[in-house]
Structure formats: structure tokens, C-alpha cells
């Protein structure tokens, strides 16, 4: 293969970029790519995971995205071929769809890769391109400008550029490609990037009219980070040995296990007979309990244990748990259930998560947003970020459209009512014409 000047294109290598790096010993000043959108990397999985295990010695040490989308792997590949900052550094431009911006919860592969890029201050800018630019897809796409040689003014910051309106209609469509970016608009995008102004505006056509619109926003890298905390609420139950609840004991695994055996022959028959007898004794115990409604688990446990003791029945932990589970129901007016150390037990059904901006402390957020509404809630401090050890798992996402959202108030009610009346008049007129023609 030759380039337009007739020179051999020696740097074009055959094979998969992800599993067979044909430029492993090279670094470059500039790197550009347009990888497949949403393409899985199953065919390269073994090689990619092996290289990931090498850590910093491989291209994929920072992390791996989900198997269904390999776009971020191409970005890691390019970063691995960047020159070190002390040698002048490099700049990378890669076009990807919206998935790498926000797919994946805190702690996921995608989030950890965004974290790596932002916490190492590598993301210089994100440029949202117009839709319908590509032959095979009309989806939204974004240019990631990544660099390890940021200017002093850009350090610790990310520029978002909304270039979604910088397009003209093509005279003839090519598949899904119906738009293109003219040269003058491309130059303007570069000017916005170079000028690096927060709140920079351009005249944009909207609904047939020109409107001065913000096309550039600048934020600190921490703007896109958050901590996902787990909020717990106490378990509250009531207990009653009513006929309906007693019947539920038959469905509890701990109770059913009494009459099950893994043995064979006479030994199995003996074990089953003993199990059936144990089940009968447990049924009699439960049916003998008072039908009084208890709103305190500890009080009910005392009644249960005393009854078992008086009959000489020894309850194993699984059977005791089965009885308590069968006879309980959630009750927001019940007393808080506590563990052996006196701490409130969490209710899994009331468990919730909250995302706290990195710029705010977890405690301040909790006291402002959670405690006023659920005073008995608490933060599960055992769920911590594996990297910094702080409460809450760190995540990063870039919801691009949120930063350029402009509230558009609804039309005045009078205008809407006038439109409805006009439509009603038209309907009555049309019905009159139809019925008149039928009568004729």
C-alpha cells in the first residue's frame, strides 16, 4: 500500500490492534482514531486480559471496560504510545459514541477508566459533534482530546464544546450520513478550543431563528466525580403466632431441612423419621404460642425461648431463624431490631444509595439531603473506595447534555387554549361537511 505521494505506507500493519500491537516499541507526538462503536472485544479477550495483568508494563493496566464495548481500550492503546511528558508529551484525539462518557456505575471498569483519565489530568476537551455524520449510524458522537502536555491554563480543567449545531445538510445522503461539517465551521470549533473561554457563545439557528447560545463550558476535573454511598434504615418487625403466619413455617428452608437426608438405605429412613418427629415437635411448639402481636423482636424471642425450654425442645439456629422469619412482618411502628452488640440491623428492602459530589463531604450531604427526611437512617461506613479508603465508592461520569441544558418555559396557557379551541372548531366543521355529504 502506498500513500498519496507514492511512498510505501510502512506504518500500516495487519492484525487486531487490541491483541497484536504492531507498534509496541514506538511512541508518537499525535494520535487519532475512530474505533468501532459498541463493538465487543470477545475475540481479543484472552490477549487483552493477559496484558491487563501486567499492570503498568502493558497497555491495559488502568482497567478494562465491559466485554460488550471496546472503545476505551483503543484510547488506552493510544495513551500507551504517547511520549512521556518530560520528552514533550503527546496529544490524542479519538471519536467515540456517548457510551464511554457515562456507562458503568461507580467502581465499574468504565468508571475506573474515566477516573484514571481525569485524576491524572489527561482529558483536555470533549467536543460534541452533530448527529448523522457517519455512513453507518446517525447517533451522537464525541471527540475526546487527551493530552499529557496541557498548558498551565488548562491544568486541572476540562473544556466541553457543544458543536452539535455546526453542520449543513448534504445534497445527497450516504446511508445514515445526511450532514457534514463545512470547513469554516470546523475552523470555528478549533478556535473555540484554542480560545478556552468559559461561556463562549455562537449564533445558532434554532426553530428557524438565530439565537446566541453558549457552546463552551470549562469545569474542574473533580466536577465529574462522585462518591456512591449506601444509606441504611433500621429493620422494624412485628411477630405473631397467628394461623396464617404459622402456616408459612412449612415453606421455610430451615424447617424443611429437618426432614431431608443425604444418606441411603436404612440410615436415610432413620434420619427422615427423626426429622419428621422434630418437625412435629416444632409445629406443636409454634401452635402453642400466644397469638398476641409483639412489636419488639427481643420480647418475642424471650417468649419463644421460654416456651421451647418448658417443653424440653432444643432449637437449632436454622430452625429458630425459620420460626422467626415465618412469624414476622415488616412494621414501621415496630421497635428497631438490634444485633448482639446493640447496633440497629439494616433493612435490605429500605437500603438506598446516594451520589455525593466530590466537592462536598459525605457528612454534609447526608445531613442536608437525607437526615431531615429519614431521621433514623445512617451511612454504611463499611462500604469504602478500594483506592482511597474513604467512605463511598468513587465514580466518574460525564453527562454532557446536562451542562448545556437551557430551560425552555412552556407556552402561555392562553395560547394553548386558543389552539385547542381552533382545533375543536375545525373538527366540528369537518364533521359537518361529512354528515352533510352523507345526507346528500
Predicted regions and their residues:
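Conserved helix-loop functional segments at active or binding sites
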Residues: 1-4, 80, 84, 436
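S-adenosyl-L-methionine
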Residues: 1-26
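A conserved structural/catalytic subdomain of Rossmann-like adenosyl-cofactor enzymes
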Residues: 19-21, 25-432
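Charged, surface-exposed alpha-helical interface/stalk elements
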Residues: 422, 439-440
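Residue-level recognition of alpha-helical coiled-coils
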Residues: 432, 436-439
